[in-house]
Structure formats: structure tokens, C-alpha cells
Amino acid sequence: MKIALDAMGGDHGPAPCIEGAVQAAKELDVDVVLVGDETTLKQECARLGATDPRISIRHAPQVVEMHESPAAVARKKRDSSIWIATELVKSGEAGAVVSPGNTGASMVSAFFVLGLTKGVERPAIATSLPTLTGEAIMLDVGANVDCTAKHLEQFGLMGNEYGKHLFRKPNPRVGLLSIGEEDSKGNEVTKEAFKLLKASQLNFIGNVEGRDVYSGTADVVVCDGFIGNVALKISEGVADTIKKLLLKEISGSWLGRLAYPLIAGPLLNLKRRIDYAEFGGAPLLGVNGITMICHGRSSAKAIKNAIRRAKGMAEGRVHELIQRDIEESLATPPAEPSA
């Protein structure tokens, strides 16, 4: 398996990408193509001692910066690292593309180069969240700020297939994020989406509230990209604040400092559970190929784990299974409303 890595788009330059690629090649038995400015990448590889023969370089003279409009990619940056990396997936040279760069640029490249899965109206970014029972998927978390009920239904179908792959569960529990558990709670879009999801073949458990997302009540949580992105950013902020408060309390008293050796292990485990680097990246579901989107500040560990997930999805042909489910849903007549 070969993975195309946009090595130029991250906040910290190509170094974390190169280090993550080396770790992935060593631990995951995967070939990685570093896509970016050839001279820069060769210099960085030499500086970091990255000589693994499974790491190769594909020249891309342009870079999409974080502040640039994603629309500019299709108009004037088709020689950018993210565009060329995505083309490697389209041609079949790579099984997936991973990028810590401009999220919008990744989406635009996937849309124009790979194309939407047949029948999919909108793609969705699916992130992984830690729960009391393990892990859950939430989608969409930023690809679409405005959604229809049909879009949310399709997010449920796509998330269900990703959940089958990720959790090795034949029938993941799918919930709809809302302001109450009752069927009648929510706005008009979510109430209509509730009806569509309930009539589908999914293991739909109904509405889930924000407080239930991390309890493990649902394996897949469906929402629009505006709500999902806000919820994700709040969660990241809360996790970071709790971590800082804990350290402040521990270091602020002699009793805390005395007890630290006894609680260091559990604290380290907690940090690992909520660390985004453990999950690596979030796939863009609903396109004809595997696109993995990472944090701009991704570490080498995060890049390695994003490659791990991208490799697994490519080997599992998750995008093809999503297409099958979408086609089946479109071929199935809507259920008659109950009396």
C-alpha cells in the first residue's frame, strides 16, 4: 500500500510529516510519497536522516497556505502539494491521501479530482471522539454549515459504514445530535432527519444530547457541520483546560506534588485517551477515494496514526461500501408515514 502525504501544508513545515512518514513506513509496512517542493523535502530528509527506501518524493512547486481561499486551489494552484497528492489517488498510484494542510483545500481537491460518490449530495468530515466505552464517530464536523434532512440521512449512512470498519461492529448505533431525546425535539431539519433515519435500515437509536456524546451511548453521532465543528472545538478547549487545571492544582500544593508519582500513570493514560494525535486524522466521506484530513499542528505521531487509518480504510474499500449503501438507499422507496 502506498500513501500520498501532502508534506508542505502543515503549520510546522515538512519536518513532522517526514518523521511521521518514517515511523509509518517502519511500523505499518507502508510506502509513503512525500508531495511538495523537491529541494526542500530532500534537504529536510537529509537533516532528519530519513533514508528509508519506502519514502519517496513527488515534486509539487506550489503550496496552499492556511490563510488562502480553498477556491483558489482549483483556479490557480493545480500544481500544489495537496492537488498533486490527490491526483496520485485518482490515478491509482496511491491508495489514500493524507494532509495536515488547509482543510478547505483538501476538500476542494477531493471534490474536483476524485469526485463525489454516486448519489452523495454532500461529503462529510468524520472525526473520532473518546468516550467512556472507547470511541465514537461524529459527522459532519465542518464540511457543510447548512444541511438538509436528506444530507443528515446520508451522513448517517456514511458514518455507519465507517463505524463498521473502525469498530468492527456489524451494526453500529447511530444517533442524531439534538437538544432532547424526544422525537419532537429539535428544529425542522433535525425532526425531518429523525424520520428519515428511523425509516432507514440503520440501527438508529434516536436523538442524543450533547452530554451523551462522550458517554458511549452512540457509535455514530450525526449533525450538520456548523454544530459539529462548534462542538468539536468546545470539546478540545474543555480537554485542554482540564489538563491545565489539573497540572495547576497538582503543582500548587505540597500534597499534590507528593501524590504525583502515584497518579502519574493514570494521568498519562487520560492524556493519551483525549490526545487528538492518537486518532491521527478525520476522513472526508462521500468522495471516490480516501482523503484523510489532519490538524495543521499535527505531530509526527499524529501523521503516523493518520496514515494508519487511511491505510486501513483503503484496504477495507470503505469508500466503495459507502457508495453501495447510498445506492441502496436511493433505490429503496420511502417508508409510509405511520398513522
What are these regions (language model features)?
Residues 111-125, 130-138, 217-221, 225-337:
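Glycine-rich phosphate/nucleotide-binding loop
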